[in-house]
C-alpha cells in the first residue's frame, strides 16, 4: 500500500485543544466487523468500556510517564534553539530533535536557560541522520525537572498550563521517560479502573517510552522505505504470566493504546522482554498477542493510522473515521476513543 492510502481530510475544529472536564466524559466509537469484514459502527460513551471489556479479559496499560522534555536555549553564536528530547540514552545523554535557524555543529555547545535565570550547557556529540545526541553535565532527569517544559503535541495550539500538567498524564503513569502521553489511557480514572476490577476485568502494565518520533510524518510514498523511530520498552514477568493465563482461560488481551500493542507485539516477535523497538505495523501484519484495541483517532498519513488499519481492516477504519468526522467526534490526544477487535476475537 502507498502513503496516500492513509490520508483523510479533517476539519481543524475537530482537533481537541483541551481535555474534557472529566477523563471518562469522552465518546467511544465501537467498530465491529462482521463475517464479510464490513464495519458496524456503534456510538457509545467511554464508560461503556465496562460493557465492552468482559470478565476474564485483560486490559494492558502503558505506565510510562511524560517528562518535561522541551528545552530552550541559545547557541554559541547567540541564536535561539529549542531541543526536544527524543529518547534518553544514558544517565547524562539523550537523543534530541533541534529547532533552530541553523543547527549547531557537533562539538559545539548550547546554553540552556529557564525562567528563573538559571543556565547550564550541553555539548553536541553526535548525529544519526535524524536525531542529535547531546551530553548533559548532570543527570538528564534532574535537569529536565528544573529546566524542561511539558511537550504538548504540535497540533495543540496553547502553551502547556497547570491543567495539561495533570491531564496529559495517565492515572497509571509511574515510569518517567515519555515525550508524548499514551493517550488511550487518558480516558481512565481511578473510579472506572476499580469498577473494571469489580466486574472481573483484569489489568496489567507494560512500559514503552513514547518518543517525539511518534509525531514525525511519514514522507515516503512507498511505505517499505519508511525508517521507523526506536522506542524503549519493557514488559514485567507478571504481565507475561497474566497474558498466558488470560489466553489459556479464553479471555481477550485488550491493549490500551497503540504503544501497549507495539510493546506486546515486539516482545512476541523478539522474545525479549525489554529493549528498543522500531516495529512498524502495516496492513498484512499478523498479530500474535493482542485481540482488541482501545485507541484514540490518529493523524492522517501517520504510522499509527497504518497500525489501526492493519488491526481492523483498511476499509473498516476509513468508514469509522468518516463516521467520526460526520458525527463530530473529537480527534487526537485530547479527543475521543475507538474500541476495535480483530474479526476472530469479536464476542457477541
Curated annotation (Swiss-Prot):
One of its GO terms (cellular component) is cytoplasm. Pathway: tRNA modification; tRNA-queuosine biosynthesis. InterPro entries: QueA, QueA_dom1, QueA_dom2, QueA_sf. Its EC number is 2.4.99.17. Disulfide bonds: none annotated. Keywords: Cytoplasm, Queuosine biosynthesis, S-adenosyl-L-methionine, Transferase. The keyword S-adenosyl-L-methionine applies. It catalyses: 7-aminomethyl-7-carbaguanosine(34) in tRNA + S-adenosyl-L-methionine = epoxyqueuosine(34) in tRNA + adenine + L-methionine + 2 H(+). It comes from the Bacteria. Transfers and isomerizes the ribose moiety from AdoMet to the 7-aminomethyl group of 7-deazaguanine (preQ1-tRNA) to give epoxyqueuosine (oQ-tRNA). HAMAP family: QueA (MF_00113). This is S-adenosylmethionine:tRNA ribosyltransferase-isomerase. The gene is queA.
